[in-house]
Amino acid sequence: DYDSDHRLICIDNLQGRSYSHTFQIDASYVLFKSLTLTAAYRLNDVKATYGGILRERPLTSKYKGLFTASYKTPDGRWQVDGTLQLNGGGRMPQPYQLADGTQSWNRRFKAYEQVSAQLTRWFKHWSVYVGGENLTGFTQHTTIYGADNPWGTDFEPTLIWGPVHGRMFYAGVRVNI
């Protein structure tokens, strides 16, 4: 129960209710022979009792949306894939006032998008590929609160709700045995 006291990790039996309801819908459509589109949406309603109050679970995105497109050339030698992922915002644990009078962190984190893409060249028994993840370059602004003083009372390394790495690129070879 992080909302009770930011300096303590309280592990005890739940005194109240908790639940997790998820609704998901997805669809895939072949627009034409070589192009497949997929869309998905997931809505999360996750709550638990904190300090006697039924509240939204912290650090949990309210929704996630996904859209993918995959195109393979008619000869099957080239394939390009792209993904757009929308991550909904959510609640942060209860903030507190720092010694300088400012708030430790915002009450909520905002929604963000991520884009990834990959290009593949297929051969008879192997393939090569290049791609990138998090092409928008979005990262969580503050990943470790109080990082300048890891022994201080305001040090907090566990409030991760989004990407901590920026754009990443990769290349590789796949061998079919």
Predicted regions and their residues:
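Generic, ordered loop/turn and secondary-structure boundary motif
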Residues: 3, 113, 136-139
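Surface-exposed loop/turn segments flanking beta-strands in extracellular/periplasmic regions
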Residues: 1-12, 149-158
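Short, glycine/charged-rich beta-strand-loop motifs at protein surfaces that mediate ligand recognition
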Residues: 102-108, 115-119, 126, 158-159
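Residues that define the transmembrane beta-barrel architecture of outer-membrane proteins
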Residues: 17-21, 59-65, 111-115, 124, ...
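C-terminal beta-signal and adjacent terminal beta-strands/loops
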Residues: 86-95, 120-177
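Gram-negative outer-membrane beta-barrel transporters
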Residues: 3-95, 174-176
